[in-house]
Amino acid sequence: MYRSLLHNVSLKATSRIIRRSVSSQAKGASGKRKQKAKEMESSHDRNRRWTSLGNQAEGRDPHKCSSFKVVSYNILAQDLLLEHLFLYVGIPHEFLSWQRRQQNLLRELLKLDPDILCLQEMQFDHLPVLVQRLRMGNGKKLAYVYKKKTGCRTDGCAIVYDSSKFELLDHQAVELYDQAVALLNRDNVALFARFRFKKQQEQQKEFVVATTHLLFNTKRSDVRCAQVERILEELQSFSTDTPIVLTGDFNSLPDSSPIEFLVGKNGDVDSTACPEPLHFEIIDSGEGTASTYQNEWVIVDYILRSLGSRSRHKLLPLSVYSLPSINRCIGAGQIPNYRLGSDHYALGAVFTVV
């Protein structure tokens, strides 16, 4: 009986040790999973930072002036993703579903918390739900204007704005398709919106926000040049004496003709259509950075501000949401992924009207 009692005690002790070991292993595995999840949770934050541009040194407190945050984002239309699935080989299908991507996009956009959000590849039937969920998440009175691509495409450009902060004075949708112009035979569009601050002391300050998504075909820079020229013609008329924030996916490298034309270098474009062309400055998102992958990590997305003395007021950039470095992009791998809902990175900038 004594031996039996010792045997039972030994069995119970062994059982307790095994349970403790299993429990410890489970806690360890759970801890590792949580740590990995935490690392993945914060990996995006480590790649992206808001960087001051130093313009506060001009004696203006950005919290007491007419400042606003703009985010521009090509969010990858689901219909286009499904049409070009071969571009996303190697990415788990769960990361490509609209439900998962929308969840990731909402999390990112709510954290960025823009006053004005410019979207490219915004699928028309997804826009109302996306905006409603943003409203529920940030409590802002969001409104929007939208322009679908010409023809049968289901995506286009949207400008979402905080209607409690801004009054929408006017907007214009521009189709970059013109039967009379040989190079303007594509379905791309642009969208303009003119805003005024609602605060009584700032009501005289107006500005224009414009967004576009130019042709993708890497061999047709001539078409993109013609599209830029048309956008500038329309912007010149629409903006009159109002400063402009121009955003979008231009599918053009920084040293390409379309971008050089925008920043006043003219490139290979005949500027006779704009006798007094608008000139812009790129809000620099950092050296050696990238916004998307096109056979290599490149920048094709931009936020720009208009320059010159034609405007009563001017836009002063206060800070920029720095893009990830090419090395970080390579390390992070393909996008969309576990945390990011698009195949582009979002751009952001804070401006003040002076």
UniProtKB/Swiss-Prot annotation:
Using the UniProt annotation, give all residue ranges assigned to the region (Disordered).
22-59
The UniProt record lists the keyword Repeat: no
UniProt keyword annotations, A-Z? Developmental protein
What are its GO biological-process terms? mitochondrial mRNA 3'-end processing
Supply one GO CC term from the record. Answer: mitochondrial matrix
Tissue distribution of the protein: Ubiquitously expressed in embryos.
Q: Which Gene3D superfamilies match?
A: Endonuclease/exonuclease/phosphatase
InterPro entries, A to Z: CCR4/nocturin_mRNA_transcr (IPR050410), Endo/exonu/phosph_ase_sf (IPR036691), Endo/exonuclease/phosphatase (IPR005135)
The UniProt GO MF terms for this protein read: catalytic activity; mRNA 3'-UTR binding
Q: Does the keyword Metal-binding apply?
A: no
Its family remark reads: Belongs to the CCR4/nocturin family.
The family database entries (PANTHER family) matched by this protein are listed as: CARBON CATABOLITE REPRESSOR PROTEIN 4, PROTEIN ANGEL
> Mind telling me what this protein is named?
Protein angel
Q: Which organism is it from?
A: Drosophila melanogaster (Fruit fly)
Q: Name the gene behind this protein.
A: angel
